[in-house]
Amino acid sequence: MIDRIASGFHPFVLPFLAGMFFVFGYCIFGVIKILLQLPRADRLQFYKSLVTPETAVKNVKDIFLNCLLHVKLWKRNPMLGFMHSSIAFGWFMLIVLGHVEVILFVPERIKFFYYPIFFNYFVAEADSTVQGSLLFFLMDFFLLVVLVGIALAVVKRFRSLIFGMRRTTRPSLLDLVGQYALWAIFPLRWLAEGFTAHISGGSFMTIPLNWIARQFLGNEFNMLPTWWAYSIALSVFMFVLPFTRYMHIPAEMLLIPMRNAGLHIRHARKGFARAEIFSCPSCGVCIDACPMSVKKSNLKDCTVYLNRHIRRGHEKRVDEISDKCLLCGKCQAVCQVGVEGPTLRIAQRATRRYNIEQDYSRIDVQPLTEAAMGSKVLYFAGCMTQLTPRIPRAMESVLKKAGVNYVWMDRDGGLCCGRPMLTAGKLGEAKQIIRKNEQIIKDTRAHTLILSCPICYKIFKEHYNLPGVRVIHHSQYLDELVKLGKLSPIKGAASVVWHDPCELGRGSGIYEAPRSLIGRCAELREAGNNSAESI
């Protein structure tokens, strides 16, 4: 391969360069803004993680698997996964192989940012080599992979049910501009490289196209408009990218190392939350998953639209959508990016200011009796369990049968775990309640706290500071008692379906203990939607 243009430049590359410099500048500014919004401790933690070998390897692995191969979508629907990964990974390989071509054949041109993108215009094939033929084949192969992905994307735009999606998001005008520009990029690249294949070489995709084109368009000047069109399509896509759903492409590459560094949402709009909001791909997978979406009027309140309105600064709609959520976490479970919809909503609620201040610091809770102070096991039923008296009565019976020395912490009433205040965004008030409960538990010197309510379990596990105290759900504790031989359930003929509670399953990752326990007592059958996708 040799240069056929001495200057190594043609004006048609200018639209591409303008778009590339714009999107690079925008992303660099965005990254700096997000990092500066992080608390100093989080920022230092993030920087440290980047130079930690284990975390660095995990970052590369996760970016490759999630940003290029879209493994989560493959697991959800193979056709949907193939569509996304063929475009992302195929485009990535075209860029990589383009750089390989420049380095191998015209290394002095690698300094030109645009050369690997428009390589076939600027070079001529002097003689055929094995290296060149292999690269031509690979370039055509990955171009075909991307074109297949684009074709599937066009089909999905009008027939999403084929890809397992009953509903998709409504695209904005700029989303449509970006989408059509993306769809145009690779057919135009195929045409452009096809027009020059008799000069720069090609393979099974470009050479046949070149032969057909030369039958009707013999003038070689006809090839230039296609290269202009290819460059302009790239430029349009990059100029609109920051203002469309496609911003998730660069944003997710920042979100992954931030998440692997152990960062969390601390503000509704800043820092880590901002990275999550811009990483939302607006694919609409969360719409079908949301239990509220069974009513058509609720479709506009799903997490994907919350992220969209936050990005656009539509404060009224953000407040409305933040309230219209059961916080079940199913949207987060199915999201390919892992956007924390419930946490974003709670953080948004926390930004509100109320005219009435609530102060729980003066609550005086009656301490447990002296007899309870020596008990090693505490049982906390919780507000919701108290509304179903059979549950705590059954727990009492079973614990006595197993000979467990326990105390029912909230038998005669007690403080709530703090969940209602937390989900309302009243974090200060919730902390006051939590501190009171912590003191009561610490005073008993108990080493185990059993909870029946999945909501209470998650709150105690994640928000309480109880060193030396094992927090456990009653299904786990009873399963342990059975395995230790302290309980001997008799298996009956009943057939039982277990519903995974949102807070116990998706929220806390406890799936096996309840099933193990039920399986010893009855025939266990699985529901259609279970485990992480339980309704």
Name every feature range the model reports, one short phrase each.
Residues 258, 293-323, 338-363:
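Non-heme iron-sulfur electron-transfer modules
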Residues 273-294, 317-339, 501-503:
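Cysteine-centered iron-sulfur cluster-binding motifs in ferredoxin-type domains/subunits
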Residues 249-272, 297-316, 393, 514-519:
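Short, charged low-complexity linear segments at domain edges
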Residues 1-271, 287, 349-352:
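Membrane-embedded alpha-helical bundles of multi-pass integral membrane proteins
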Residues 95, 103, 194, 200-201, ...:
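Flexible loop/turn segments at secondary-structure boundaries
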Residues 97, 184-187, 213-217, 266-268, ...:
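Iron-sulfur cluster-binding electron-transfer modules in prokaryotic oxidoreductases
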Residues 219-221, 271-275, 308-320, 481-482:
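Active-site-adjacent structural elements in folded domains
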